[in-house]
């Protein structure tokens, strides 16, 4: 018996990441080759014509799993009965714009969207914020949703999977091992250059990746800066931000959350107090996913170097939380 369609809301649907994302969702890459989907596409009024063009292309692919589409500039319509929400659209940082200004501008957007999700979506909705600063935007959306109730406040995530995938790629190149062999990668903290990609627990076919690398200077001076500043390097090379790799990471995050994973995955989730991270902070942590849910991997040793790195990225997130605190009252 065929499955009933699920509803997937995507914001910023006319943008570059949206364009890289929607066709893969419609083809079944995110939720499985047996799961029909209805796409509910949100973008600004001035982008509606472009959204219609994307919908025309989606129609022209004749995807067997694409059961319907909706285009709108109204969050209440976009999130109606949604089972999955990918919040891609965000205010980009403009010339001369301070980070505080960016946080304020996005705070307004994600307050509205969090409230609309909580009021309209499926009670078990899974929400992934891709639009930056994604940790704090997820925190804002979750805080707005919490005031409404209905939805699970732990299901408002920020996307750290791009950092996780970038780290795996760099380690594969360093060790000469295939990416597919690398397990138990962790990225702690904020999706920003302060993130801490931690391969102390990582293995490749049973071998310790830390022992294979055995080079602290490379870790500190090459690996971490390369992963942390990869987005800027891509903008410098391409003239545009990383869209396809961001869309790929969003697919990975949602796929594993919905369908499960046999490996640790990095997810930006509201902290439960683990590892000394204050409760509620949306923080990148190692998780395992099964049966449509996730749980934080517990009991990992945090050495002095790692604690210093974790505290640095936590400090940045605490500053961001403080900057938006007045908006959330």
Swiss-Prot record:
CDD domains for this protein: MDH_chloroplast-like
Positions with a binding annotation for substrate: 93, 99, 132, 166
Signal peptide: none
Top-tier EC class: oxidoreductase
Keyword flag Oxidoreductase: yes
Residues the record lists as binding NAD(+): 12-18, 106, 113, 130-132
Top-rank lineage group of the source organism: Bacteria
Protein name in UniProt: Malate dehydrogenase
Organism of provenance: Aromatoleum aromaticum (strain DSM 19018 / LMG 30748 / EbN1) (Azoarcus sp. (strain EbN1))
């Amino acid at each position: 018996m065929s499955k009933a369609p699920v509803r997937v809301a995507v914001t910023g649907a006319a943008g570059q990441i949206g364009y890289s994302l929607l066709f893969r969702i419609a083809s079944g890459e995110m939720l499985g080759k047996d799961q029909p989907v209805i796409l509910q596409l949100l973008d600004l009024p001035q982008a509606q014509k472009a959204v219609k063009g994307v919908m025309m292309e989606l129609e022209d692919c004749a995807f067997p799993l694409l059961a319907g589409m909706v285009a709108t500039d109204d969050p209440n319509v976009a999130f109606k009965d949604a089972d999955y929400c990918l919040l891609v659209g965000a205010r980009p940082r403009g010339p001369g714009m301070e980070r505080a200004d960016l946080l304020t501008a996005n705070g307004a957007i994600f307050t509205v969207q969090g409230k609309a999700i909580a009021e309209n979506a499926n009670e078990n909705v899974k929400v992934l914020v891709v639009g930056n600063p994604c940790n704090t935007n997820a925190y804002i959306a979750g805080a707005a949703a919490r005031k409404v109730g209905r939805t699970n406040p732990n299901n408002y995530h920020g996307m750290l999977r791009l950092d996780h995938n970038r780290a795996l790629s760099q380690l594969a190149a360093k060790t000469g091992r295939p990416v597919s062999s690398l397990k138990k990668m962790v990225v702690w903290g904020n999706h920003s250059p302060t993130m801490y990609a931690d391969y102390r627990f990582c293995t490749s076919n049973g071998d310790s990746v830390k022992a294979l690398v055995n080079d602290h200077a490379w870790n500190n001076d090459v690996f971490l800066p390369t992963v942390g500043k990869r987005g800027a390097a891509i903008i410098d090379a391409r003239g545009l931000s990383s869209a396809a790799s961001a869309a790929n990471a969003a697919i990975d995050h949602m796929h594993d959350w919905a369908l499960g994973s046999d490996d640790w995955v990095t997810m930006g989730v509201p902290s439960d107090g683990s590892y000394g991270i204050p409760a509620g902070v949306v923080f990148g942590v190692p998780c395992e996913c099964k049966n449509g849910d996730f749980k934080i991997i517990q009991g990992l040793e945090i050495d002095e170097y790692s604690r210093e790195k974790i505290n640095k990225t936590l400090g940045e997130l605490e500053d961001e939380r403080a900057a938006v605190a007045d908006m959330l009252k």
